Amino acid sequence: MGSSKKITVSYWYKLILHLGWCKGPIDALLEIRGGDRAAWRGRQTANGIININKPNLYGGESAEGGIAGQFEVMLGGADQMPNSYLAAEFGDAQPGYRGRSTIVLRGPKIGAGNPYPKPLYFKLRRIFKGWDDGVCWGKNSNGVPSKQPRHWRYK
């Protein structure tokens, strides 16, 4: 009648990626989204690893999976060292990517049961760090630009 053979219902995507955001350094990473859903929210203000464990973010294995794994944040400081995970995977000749804010996906499982993984979106803050001359325009205004008319630009 039936076979005792197991049927594969879906596949997970396991990604190793190094994504660049912008010129660094940045102040913080605030959010990681997969598609239209938040996978992580917080305030990552130093280089380090974020662990996300939301395998049911899109409905689990029976639907479109989720996100589960490690994301290594590199904010782009002048003293940023080469990434140890990239060196282990692709060889020791890795730059430090100083002056570049990036994230390394350390093989997380993303999505399942869908041939198109959800796009990743990142919410960053770059207000006080990364100025060309090292001087911020408004440290006293807590990152909120002045609304005085002299600061408005007209065309």
Q: Across the structure, where does each feature detected by a protein language model lie?
A:
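Polar, S/T/G-rich
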Residues: 1-155
